[in-house]
C-alpha cells in the first residue's frame, strides 16, 4: 500500500471523487456553506474541481463545475454528483428537489437528474441545470422483455422492490410512457406480465396518453401476475409507446412479437 496523501481542497464540505479525463486527473467535490469573500470566486454548496497530472496531486483549483441546484430550480440543499462517460460524452449526474416542489412540499427530498458536460481544452465548462436533461441515447428494443419500470414518463404510478421491481399503485387513468421504441420489424402482439385484483383493461397507444389506440389488453381479476396478450396493428418505425390503465393493476414487463 502507498502512503496516503491529503488533497488541500479549498472550502471542502463533502461528496468528493477523482476522474481521469484525457491525461488530466480531476478532483471534484462539494464546497461548504461558508464561502463568502473567498478569492476563488466559488459559491456555497457547489461542485468545484481541481486538476493534476498525477492522481496523488498536487492539485490546482480549476473552477466551479456546477452551482448549487437551487440557482436553477429554486430549492437549495446539499449538492451531490457523479461524472460518467457514455458513448464518448461526459455527463453530470446530480440531484435536485423538483419532484417535491411540484408536490408543494418541502422535506429536502431529492430526485436524480443529468445534464451534459462540455469542455474547453482541460477546462470543465460550468454546467447549467435543466429540466430537459439529455437526449435518449438509443432506441428501445421491443422484441426482448422490457421491465415496466423502464420508462421515460409516467402519471400516478409507483415502483416497488429492489432489483426485480414492479410498477405498482396503478389506478384508473394512470399511464407509463416508453419513448423511442424501434418497431422497424413491426409487431402483431404485445404481451404484458401484469396483475389486477378486480380486472383491468390496458390501452396501448402511441404519441400521447390520448393518442390512437393500437391495441387493448385485458388483465384478469385475481391479483396474480400472468401474461396477457394484446393484438396490435400499425406499429412501425420509431414510436413513443403508452400503456394507459382503466383501473387497479401492477405490471412487471412487456414484449412485442
Residue ranges and their predicted role:
Residues 1-257:
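Carbohydrate-active catalytic/glycan-binding domains of CAZyme proteins
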Amino acid at each position: 500500500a502507498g502512503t496516503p496523501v491529503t488533497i488541500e481542497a479549498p472550502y471542502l464540505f463533502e461528496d468528493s471523487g477523482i476522474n481521469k479525463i484525457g491525461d488530466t486527473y480531476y478532483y471534484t467535490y462539494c464546497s461548504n456553506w461558508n464561502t463568502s469573500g473567498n478569492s476563488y470566486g466559488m459559491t456555497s454548496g457547489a461542485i468545484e474541481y481541481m486538476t493534476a497530472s498525477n492522481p496523488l496531486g498536487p492539485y490546482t483549483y480549476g473552477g466551479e463545475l456546477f452551482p448549487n441546484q437551487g440557482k436553477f430550480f429554486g430549492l437549495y440543499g446539499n449538492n451531490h454528483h457523479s461524472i460518467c462517460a457514455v458513448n464518448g460524452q461526459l455527463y453530470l449526474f446530480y440531484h435536485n428537489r423538483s419532484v417535491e416542489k411540484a408536490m408543494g412540499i418541502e422535506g429536502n427530498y431529492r430526485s436524480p437528474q443529468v445534464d451534459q458536460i462540455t469542455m474547453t481544452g482541460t477546462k470543465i465548462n460550468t454546467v447549467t441545470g435543466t429540466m430537459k436533461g439529455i437526449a435518449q441515447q438509443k432506441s428501445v428494443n421491443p422484441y426482448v422483455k422490457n421491465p415496466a419500470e423502464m420508462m421515460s414518463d409516467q402519471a400516478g404510478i409507483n415502483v416497488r422492490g429492489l432489483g426485480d421491481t414492479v410498477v405498482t399503485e396503478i389506478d384508473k387513468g394512470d399511464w407509463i410512457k416508453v419513448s423511442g421504441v424501434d418497431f422497424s420489424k413491426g409487431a402483431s402482439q404485445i404481451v404484458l406480465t401484469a396483475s389486477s385484483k378486480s380486472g383491468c383493461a390496458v390501452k396501448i397507444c402511441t404519441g400521447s396518453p390520448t393518442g390512437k389506440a393500437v391495441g387493448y389488453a385485458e388483465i384478469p381479476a385475481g391479483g396474480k401476475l400472468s401474461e396477457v396478450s394484446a393484438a396490435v396493428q400499425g406499429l412501425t418505425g420509431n414510436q413513443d409507446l403508452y400503456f394507459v390503465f382503466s383501473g387497479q393493476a401492477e405490471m412487471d414487463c412487456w414484449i412485442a412479437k
